[in-house]
């Protein structure tokens, strides 16, 4: 199979310069962090950032912290904290004893804000949100704040009273004093603290003022000894503010911020707001619906950690935004499962096949290889009898051109691993529907090879012993969105939903070896695709399998 060329990682090149002799971090351990906001489940877009953060530390023999960015009190939830930790562990990464919350630093954030006020580098402002926008200025007009020259002692007093809860939400803010005429609007005296009388999931009601991300984040990085703060490209214009903060407060370290492009994938949305709308409005069954791009959804669908890590590694690290084909993600999964998944036989749309010249009441067994790509995977025993299940579309009463499966007086076909058969006819009900296919077998073709060496012109088809099988429900998934770019500006993403993204098949027939199948096992249903037991709904009493990916590969990699 063709390999995908790995993009050159410019982040690694920067770090190599930094840790080389004479570099800004020469002799230091590379230290990164992954700072998710615990207000939703991680998705494949976060996964790229996660793998860059943890993978970079891994490459350079360094450390990576896990820090929950819970500075915003309105959205955080312990449920999401636990789910994020589970997802990271599932991917094979470990933060050791370096697990933190942004809210752990609230007291230090406050102290550094007071330090800025005392240095004349921050002031309490009384502009309302509407006035703030009105006085923001434009590229040719500086911003304005009539409170910029407020005396230091007055700002210190007001800021202390803000913390004490004396004022209403938005009545006051604390702003950094930088440059009201800057061409970078992030530097036009940005708000670094605002009043929010809200319950915090960890701090309770202890705080009613909260630091802005652009202020808290660089301080948290510096206090944790982060050398390289890796973040997505939308923070590129925030880097001057990041540097300003660490240069003007008394932190022990000055990290370097490096930006990379976010991951975009066609036929999906990665906005938490839009994903939440899909869940809350019932378009999907939950955050872990196998059609969702969340890691828990991908895991439930049967994606493996190796396939996701390979996908992110091969996409590489870019400076410019790009959109990757969903087919490439499927390609990486298919590549992994082709090497590891056990081959089994399952019939999703069954019709009865009767071998009319096979002795009634007789049964025999065959040894079938579990994976032709892995001899160490061994074999398994399956049973064979007169009565079998085959796929309904493996028979046609009246064949079409080039059809090489079963039809009356058609070519001989192989039953996978068993015998060669010839179709002799069928049985129909009163409405003309085929209810049973009839065939004879060649007793001298055990294993699928005729004794006389004749060429078998028909297809090889899979089957299941009707007298020794299990029933199953099978869920076949396809793209959640018909539109390749449902996230495009001006589009109603809900109008782009694919009404046929889920097909549920009941009464499917599978080998008895699958009776005890449990997630995260993966199987190749021969000729059909790769499937896994559903990690929520499948049980010994009610088997449920999800199609992870089809056998057919629509993605064409570059050589």
Residue ranges and their predicted role:
Residues 66, 70-72, 115-275, 333, ...:
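Active-site cores that bind ATP or allylic diphosphates and position pyrophosphate for catalysis
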Residues 7-16, 20-85, 199-232:
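N-terminal catalytic cores of NTP/NDP-binding nucleotidyl/phosphoryl-transfer enzymes
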Residues 235-239, 243-245, 306-309, 313-315, ...:
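Core subunits and conserved enzymes of cellular information-processing
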Residues 36-38, 67-75, 97-107, 130-131, ...:
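Conserved short loop/turn motifs at secondary-structure junctions
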Residues 21-26, 55-63, 89-96, 222, ...:
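Secondary-structure transition/capping motifs at alpha-helix termini
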Residues 44, 76-79, 128, 186, ...:
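Short, solvent-exposed loop/turn and secondary-structure capping segments
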Residues 80-106, 112-113, 120-122:
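A glycine-rich helix N-cap at a beta->alpha junction
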Residues 253-332, 336:
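Long, charged, mostly alpha-helical binding arms that flank functional sites
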